[in-house]
């Protein structure tokens, strides 16, 4: 009887867990739809900025070797790389399966790779998971940003990327790389590594049928264009990462719900078997008692 009570208690516990994971799955599904739409819109805008950059690339190529213009230093790849800044995004919350693993593994591998080349790598961490992981590994973080990956904010994204751009312009770093796990579709996430700074001018010419007219000239346009380019790449990465996080959490909760269902089924079978054995034992005892009274 005590065994039956224990199994019944387990069934109730697992069933409650199933309800919780199913509710979290539904919440993640709703959030995913919203984040997916935001990611799609942001991607289109980011692609348009890149197209504009491609359109004026022929002008950039003409003036990119002008070392005196600070704006153009963002296009100069340094001959010797001594310091690299790595911005990476992880989730602020858990229960999202292996969403963070790809990013953390890639960042750890890049750390080893650059250290083997005697290149100093500085980490700018966005998201509680990544911050706690490298704190546990006792690896120093240059900057830590909490609550940004779970609630992308354009002004905060600008703050992150402006700090990296300023460090590049001031000679504190030679390269800036952005790493995040991005959204591909509802069941797949895709690791993205963006070598953000220095920018490589596109090796194409302006097309004859282009509808874009440049006013003012490329040198005057670069400052505002590059500012928007960096800011929106950072902001898009945050939105893209959030959509991927919701996708991963939806899958994780779906798997947990299915596992809970399977476990409840197993426990019900165990309960029925134990109950059947208990009834059989009681019947045998009753029959034995009747026989002994004859």
Curated annotation (Swiss-Prot):
GO terms for biological process: proton motive force-driven plasma membrane ATP synthesis. Transmembrane segments: none annotated. It holds the Pfam family ATP-synt. It is found in: Cell inner membrane. It comes from the Bacteria. One of its GO terms (cellular component) is proton-transporting ATP synthase complex. InterPro entries: ATP_synth_F1_ATPase_gsu (IPR035968), ATP_synth_F1_gsu (IPR000131). Its main location: membrane. GO terms for molecular function: ATP binding; proton-transporting ATP synthase activity, rotational mechanism. The keyword Phosphoprotein does not apply. Keywords: ATP synthesis, Cell inner membrane, Cell membrane, CF(1), Hydrogen ion transport, Ion transport, Membrane, Transport. It is a peripheral membrane protein. F-type ATPases have 2 components, CF(1) - the catalytic core - and CF(0) - the membrane proton channel. CF(1) has five subunits: alpha(3), beta(3), gamma(1), delta(1), epsilon(1). CF(0) has three main subunits: a, b and c. NCBIfam families: ATPsyn_F1gamma (TIGR01146). Belongs to the ATPase gamma chain family. This is ATP synthase gamma chain. It comes from Campylobacter jejuni subsp. jejuni serotype O:2 (strain ATCC 700819 / NCTC 11168). The gene is atpG.
